[in-house]
């Protein structure tokens, strides 16, 4: 969901809050659902960098690391053509137990600082990756992230941002 300059996603995931938290802060777990390589320093002030798709890098800095309830970090892309430099947006992930057995977690992700079509692009991206996270926390494996996006408006926006389309 897009609300002003923010993208907001809420979902219930299988697994404890600690297990879900680790999916964001352990490089081996992170690349199971988002990215193909990762270098993470999950502590306040620590940096992260991961390759989302071949040649596309996301970078940021951890602001709050409060396992297993909250993770806040800055976010941006190393490619200046994408229009969102590292540190110019912020992601706030909160986790809370859901259900009576402690084996489900309510995740709320709020990504702020996204103006114009960046909100639409990141809403699409988070939707895709959080679905992959749900598959992995449910005991499955996530399929490889598609290199090509389905045809449509988002494809045109991605190509335009990457400088691959003049339209």
Give the predicted meaning of each segment.
Residues 2, 8-9, 15, 19, ...:
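Short beta-edge strand/loop motif at the mouth of beta-sheet-based domains
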Residues 135-167:
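Short, highly charged C-terminal tails/helix-capping segments
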Residues 6, 80-135, 144-146, 166-167:
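Beta-strand/loop substructures that line and gate deep hydrophobic ligand-binding cavities in soluble
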Residues 31, 38-39, 55-104, 111-112:
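Hydrophobic-ligand binding "helix-grip"
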Residues 20, 30, 48, 62, ...:
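Hydrophobic pocket/interface hotspot
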Residues 52, 75, 158:
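Pocket-edge structural micro-motifs
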